[in-house]
């Protein structure tokens, strides 16, 4: 029985899931907007939001924890230099998931995952639409 088991398997091994969400979190922090399937988007929240909460307090220990979870120096730098300061007064809820229809090949429900309060300019909207 599968009682009290949290999280989605997504037809992947645990190592594959961990690597996938690690990569998705790095992409989200880099671009601030990504497009993925709805179940992956909902599960990505469980990975990305605690990292942003960690970045709100800049310390060597927190930077090492963030690097351990992302394995990307660029992502850690952006987390602590930009995102941690941007969300310093927000008590959670850093991500927004917007449903955006269904994928053409397999009809999978798709969604955009974006950081709330991100700076929006005309170029970012053109890049997101493509």
Curated annotation (Swiss-Prot):
UniProt keyword annotations, A-Z: Ribonucleoprotein, Ribosomal protein
Annotated Gene3D superfamilies: Ribosomal protein L17
Domain of life: Bacteria
CC terms in the record's Gene Ontology section: cytosolic large ribosomal subunit
Gene Ontology molecular-function annotations: structural constituent of ribosome
BP-aspect Gene Ontology terms: translation
Keyword Aminoacyl-tRNA synthetase: no
Claim: Ribosomal protein is one of the keywords in the record: yes
Family statement drawn from the similarity comment of this UniProt entry: Belongs to the bacterial ribosomal protein bL17 family.
Binding partners and assembly: Part of the 50S ribosomal subunit. Contacts protein L32.
Name the UniProt record assigns to this protein: Large ribosomal subunit protein bL17
Gene source species: Azotobacter vinelandii (strain DJ / ATCC BAA-1303)
């Amino acid at each position: 029985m599968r009682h009290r088991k949290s999280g989605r398997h997504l037809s992947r091994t645990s190592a594959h899931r961990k690597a996938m969400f690690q990569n998705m979190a790095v992409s989200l922090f880099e671009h601030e907007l990504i497009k993925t399937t709805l179940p992956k988007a909902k599960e990505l929240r469980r990975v990305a939001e605690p990292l942003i909460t960690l970045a709100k307090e800049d310390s060597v220990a927190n930077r090492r924890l963030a690097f351990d979870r992302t394995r990307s120096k660029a992502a850690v730098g952006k987390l602590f230099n930009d995102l941690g300061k941007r969300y310093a007064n927000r008590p959670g809820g850093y991500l927004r998931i917007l449903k955006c229809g269904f994928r053409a090949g397999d009809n999978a429900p798709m969604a955009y995952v974006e950081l709330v309060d991100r700076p929006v300019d005309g170029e970012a909207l053109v890049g997101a639409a493509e």
